[in-house]
Amino acid sequence: RMDQLLVTLSEQAIQRAAPQPGERVLDIGCGCGSTSLTMAGQGARVTGVDISEPMLANARARSAGNEMLEFILADASSHPFDTRFDLAFSRFGVMFFADPHQAFAHIRSAIQDQGRLCFICWQSPKDNPWLSVPGGAAQPFLPEPEAQPDPRAPGPFAFADPAYVQEILDQAGFTSIAIEPCSADMRLGSDVEEAVAFLLRNGPMSRVLAEVDEDLRNKALDAVRETLAPLATAEGIMLSGACWIASANQG
């Protein structure tokens, strides 16, 4: 379901990364393997890494018999790769490192001298209506956070500030760094109930709703339904998502 939501953004990121036939590609945080399969389909030899064994089992099942792909249970920030890659790529997989400066220095060491890096990450929640619109509707019924979270703490939006991303990559030794905006319409579901079910499983609102009592949860969800109902189209519930695509050379 998440792969379906991200299909347009994935296409934009892979187009920017431009994997070539015969290139060795490292897919960081590959999850269930969708981006790895796409790049292998373009002729690249792909090594997908993730820290989730269930997701990797799914990826291996989807790619059974495909000799262009391998999947490793590993943390890309520290794994001793036995090859150097032409391209290190990630779709929403690099914002969770405890020490991003160290992580990107290590990733750079796994890239060939003439190689490159390309990843896509989220802009801030307020710039992502697919989250901020339902989140804003639910907010009056949810508890205030005890403290303002560190916007750069590991998590989906840790790289929302492009200046921070630039500084991390620069310090890691990358060159020709470019950070470009991209956006796409996100299909949350075919109708309101499917969209609500999706939001209950994904995103920051799902975690908060899991912790409140049933009465508040129901009020919050009713408010979300009321907000999403006028947005229904023939294509489903569509709201925009905003990201950065970062690219850089190894040296």
Language-model segments: residues:
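Conserved alpha-helix/loop element of class I SAM-dependent methyltransferases that forms part
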Residues: 3-23, 38
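A short acidic, Gly/Pro-enriched loop at the edge of an enzyme's catalytic core
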Residues: 77-87
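Core SAM-dependent methyltransferase catalytic element
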Residues: 175, 243-251
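C-terminal helical/coil "lid" or tail adjacent to the Rossmann-like core of SAM-dependent
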Residues: 1, 176-234
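Helix-to-beta-strand junctions that scaffold the AdoMet/dcAdoMet cofactor pocket
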Residues: 97-98, 111-113
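Class I SAM-dependent methyltransferase SAM/SAH-binding core
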Residues: 24-79, 102
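Conserved catalytic/acceptor-binding region of the Class I
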Residues: 101, 116-189, 206
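A short SAM/SAH-binding and catalytic strip from SAM-dependent methyltransferases
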Residues: 86-101, 123
